[in-house]
């Protein structure tokens, strides 16, 4: 399911919260700048921001023909497909729960866990300030809570991401 893979990669690499993901539109993505715009109208911290868009995500978006949709379409409409109608933010969790059940994963693994892991991995690879900025945390202490919760893993120092698309 490539659309769900896209949602997972967005959560992990961009660190955009699920509710915010549900409000993103195709036009919020800049291929030239390799960024995603998060509007203050739906961001948790009520501030406009741009976050980096990993090249693996762009490659998958191109493969899924995301940029053939009108710019005013929501990136994740119903069934995670680009649509003029916004999909409910809970669709990410529902899809995750189905996958988790099939894979027989423990309930401790949540869709939001991808953001936690992304923050930790990015901080270990590029530094806590880069992770703070990508996660749009107002204070580095918030970012440190994510890192301390999971512990620092030396193996992530050569971070190229754990979710790949070839």
Across the structure, where does each feature detected by a protein language model lie?
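Short, basic (Lys/Arg/His-rich) helix/loop patches that form interaction surfaces
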Residues: 1-4, 14, 51, 67-73, ...
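Basic, Lys/Arg- and aromatic-enriched nucleic-acid-binding interface segment
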Residues: 1-18, 44
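Short, charged phosphate-coordinating catalytic segments
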Residues: 11-33
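Short polar/acidic secondary-structure junctions
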Residues: 27-29, 41-43, 66
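A short linear hydrophobic-aromatic micro-motif
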Residues: 36-39, 107-109
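Catalytic-site neighborhood detector that most strongly recognizes the C-terminal catalytic loop/helix
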Residues: 40-42, 46, 135-160
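C-terminal catalytic core of Y-nucleophile DNA break-rejoin enzymes
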Residues: 43-63, 71-98
């Amino acid at each position: 399911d490539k659309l769900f893979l896209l949602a997972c990669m967005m959560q992990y690499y961009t660190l955009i919260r699920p509710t915010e993901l549900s409000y993103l539109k195709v036009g919020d993505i800049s291929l030239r700048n390799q960024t995603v715009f998060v509007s203050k109208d739906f961001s948790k911290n009520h501030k406009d921001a741009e976050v980096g868009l990993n090249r693996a995500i762009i490659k998958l978006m191109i493969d899924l023909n995301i940029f053939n949709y009108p710019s005013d379409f929501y990136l994740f409409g119903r069934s995670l497909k680009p649509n003029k109608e916004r999909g409910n933010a809970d669709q990410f969790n529902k899809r995750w729960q189905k996958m988790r059940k099939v894979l027989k994963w423990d309930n401790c693994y949540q869709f939001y866990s991808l953001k936690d892991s992304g923050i930790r991995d990015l901080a270990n690879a590029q530094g806590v300030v880069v992770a703070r900025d990508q996660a749009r945390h107002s204070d580095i202490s918030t970012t440190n809570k994510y890192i301390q919760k999971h512990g620092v893993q030396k193996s992530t120092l050569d971070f190229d991401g754990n979710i790949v698309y070839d």
